[in-house]
Design a protein with these regions (language model features):
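Active-site "lid/cap" and pocket-lining segments within catalytic core domains
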Residues: 1-262, 272, 379-494
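Active-site-proximal binding-pocket segments
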Residues: 223-412
Length: 494
């Protein structure tokens, strides 16, 4: 019997482990529900609910082939050990996973168990992230080669099995408390395909122009990111569908928007590659010269104001309240939230990134922690961007539409005052700014720029570049910037 372990790849199409396993014999499609992962500080109920919806559809798709999903609950090694006693399997199939530190440790334990028990664990690449690479040279070319392979068809049928399946624990039994997210995106393959179709036929036309605003980005972005995170849709499927759309007759705007989208699919994998190459960046600074910079100055009151959207800066608060209620925010505004917490409030990126991880339905550890560090200035190799929240508000929401929706306390203010309510004589109950924006920005910039001038910083930065920076541009027909430009940093909107 072949065991296909579904992890964050909840689909039957373009699924190499499933396809290859079926060629070898009867297949047990397995999902191991691991309660311990839900006690980790980056987990939340909105993730759990999206997962359940995706598992329900996966089970239906597999059942239509002849064998539904076998669910087992518990520690992965213990579950596999029990399953081996039941079936005697000698091959385990799965996709490679670049997850959080907990899943990395679990995979190491499974690898050791497989070795000790005569099980061949066959992992296949997903999304174009390269395992075991020691250099970023030719990474873009390799990624394109991988992404332009033909998509893998689902099996024609699966042989029915007599193995028992278990029920999933309830959220409350996992310690997952209430999570008020009325605007959360729904999980499952059908929703992913509907979003992809809507993006490629209607919403994506103004993607390149409108992605930077939280008002327009909500509509024009693909909104596929949680489906990439849980694997209900593959990056290859989205990329090839976008290219096919570009080959068809198009109205003005489509060409540039679809090329921008395709570029961001590559950057999606580029950032996950950073965590694959250096799992420690989830926990420690990418550039060691920043160790100790913020660790001893965490202000709990500032963190609370930031996390609850009551900083006194309307655009910051509107963005935080929006992502809390919907699980999604366009990328520029995510970067602004992180930057404001790290620079203006001088909070360490670890705690603030965990809070955002719990809020983002599309939480992807590889992108998340690399970006958290970029917006906090601790990579040492990227442009230091300290957002002015008032300017961003005026640029991205000039008429105050987004502000009035999410910060109703100031909805009565005229447009010329809504971005700076502290200047209004009747701002009501909305709080005053918790910091002096100009002063806080200057202090943060001075601290980091002085550190960047040191010889030690420059030496370590060279090491970081060699390990993590993008190198060459991709082949000409897929050309986009091979450098980590400021634009690429902030425009991963999917």
């Amino acid at each position: 019997m072949e065991i296909v372990w579904f992890k964050r790849d909840l689909r039957i199409i373009d699924h190499a482990p499933l396809f290859e396993a079926v060629e070898c014999g009867a297949v047990c499609p397995l999902y191991i529900f691991e309660p311990d992962i839900w006690s980790q500080p980056d987990a939340s109920r909105r993730h759990y609910e999206f997962l359940l919806e995706s598992l329900t559809e996966l089970d239906a798709a597999l059942s239509a082939l002849g064998q539904g999903l076998i669910i087992r609950v518990g520690d992965a090694v213990e579950v596999l050990d029990t399953l081996k006693a039941e079936t005697g399997f000698t091959r385990l199939w799965s996709h490679q996973e670049t997850g959080n530190g907990w899943s990395y440790a679990r995979d190491l334990a499974v690898k050791e168990w497989a070795r000790a028990n005569g099980v061949s664990w066959k992992e296949r690449k997903q999304h174009g992230v390269m395992r075991g690479t020691h250099s970023r040279d030719k990474w873009a070319s390799n990624w394109h080669r991988e992404m332009y392979q033909p998509q893998i068809s689902p099996p024609v049928q699966l042989k029915p099995l007599s193995l028992p399946s278990r029920n999933l624990p309830a959220a409350a039994d996992l310690g997952l408390g209430p999570d008020d997210c009325p605007g959360r995106q729904k999980g499952g393959r059908r929703e992913a395909m509907s979003l992809l179709d809507g993006f490629l036929t209607e919403r994506g036309q103004t993607y390149r122009r409108d992605m930077s605003s939280p008002l327009t980005g909500e509509w024009t972005c693909s909104r596929l990111s949680p489906h990439f995170s849980f694997g209900t849709l593959s990056i290859r499927e989205a990329l090839q569908a976008s290219e096919a759309r570009r080959r068809a007759p198009m109205e003005k705007g489509w060409e540039g928007s679809l090329r921008a989208f395709e570029s961001r699919l590559r950057w999606h994998c580029h950032f996950i590659q950073k965590l694959e190459d250096e799992p420690e960046i989830e926990f420690r600074n990418m550039h060691a010269a920043y160790d100790g910079l913020r660790e001893d100055s965490f202000d709990a009151a500032r963190f609370t104001a930031w996390s609850e959207g009551i900083t006194g800066f309307p655009f910051i608060d509107a963005c935080m309240r929006s992502v809390t209620a919907t699980g999604w925010l366009n990328f520029r505004m995510r970067a602004m939230l992180m930057s404001f917490a790290s620079y203006h409030l001088w909070l360490h990126w670890r705690e603030t990134s965990l809070h955002l991880a719990r809020l983002f339905t599309d939480y992807e550890p590889g992108i998340h922690y690399a970006q958290a560090q970029m917006q906090s200035g601790t990579t040492g190799i990227n442009t230091m961007r300290i957002y002015n929240p008032v300017k961003q508000s005026q640029d991205q929401d000039p008429d105050g539409v987004f502000l009035r929706k999410w910060v109703p306390e100031i909805a009565h203010l005229p447009t010329h005052l809504i971005h700076t309510p502290w200047a209004a004589p009747d701002k009501g109950q909305y709080p005053d700014p918790i910091i002096n924006e100009h002063r806080a920005r200057k202090i943060a910039a001075d601290r980091l720029y002085s550190l960047r001038k040191t010889t030690t910083h420059k030496r370590i930065a060279g090491e970081v570049v060699r390990k993590h920076a993008s190198r060459a541009a991709p082949p000409r027909r897929h050309r986009s910037s091979g450098k980590e430009t400021a634009s690429a940093q902030f425009e991963l909107d999917l």
